[in-house]
Amino acid sequence: VHLSGEEKGLVTGMWGKVNVDEVGGEALGRLLVVYPWTQRFFDSFGDLSSASAIMGNAKVKAHGKKVANSITDGVKNLDNLKGTYAKLSELHCDKLHVDPENFRLLGNVLVCVLARNLGKEFTPQAQAAFQKVVLGVATALAHKYH
């Protein structure tokens, strides 16, 4: 993904302002609520029967934290997303058999969560830069599928 120096600065600056652990859990939870078919990949997470059950689920929050920490790795390696996510791409393709479209969906949900958490600081320029990043991450995670 190609980002200008200004875009990289926006992404790293905005990401540094959020509570990574919280936004990860919120983003994954919202994904599971808004796109309920994605729940099939999380059978071991227990009660996913309602929005409140999902958003309060400790396993959703814990996995969301892992996802967000992975995004932190990507933010630190914006020039090498493919390499950064190579092992995760292999895991999600070969072992977990996750539909790669779900990576794009989660990225879009994450952008919404960032907007909610950052408010006016999340400018249109920051949103556009983050959209590039989450698309780049989704593409890198889907790489093994091709």
Swiss-Prot record:
Q: Which residues carry this modification: N-acetylvaline?
A: V1
Q: Which UniProt keywords apply?
A: Acetylation, Heme, Iron, Metal-binding, Oxygen transport, Phosphoprotein, S-nitrosylation, Transport
Extract one GO BP annotation from the record.
Answer: hydrogen peroxide catabolic process
Q: Give the modified residues of type Phosphothreonine.
A: T12
Every Globin domain range: 2-146
Residues modified as Phosphoserine are S44
State whether keyword Metal-binding applies. Answer: yes
| Positions bearing N6-acetyllysine | K59, K82, K144
- Which is an annotated GO molecular function term of this record? organic acid binding
Tissue expression per record: Red blood cells.
What's any one GO cellular component for it? hemoglobin complex
| Residues reported to bind heme b | H63, H92
Which SUPFAM superfamilies does the annotation name? Globin-like (SSF46458)
Positions bearing S-nitrosocysteine: C93
Show the InterPro entries listed in the entry.
Globin, Globin-like_sf, Globin/Proto, Hemoglobin_b, Hemoglobin_oxygen_transport
Q: What does this protein do?
A: Involved in oxygen transport from the lung to the various peripheral tissues.
Quaternary assembly? Heterotetramer of two alpha chains and two beta chains.
User: What's this protein's family per the entry?
Assistant: Belongs to the globin family.
Q: What is this protein called?
A: Hemoglobin subunit beta
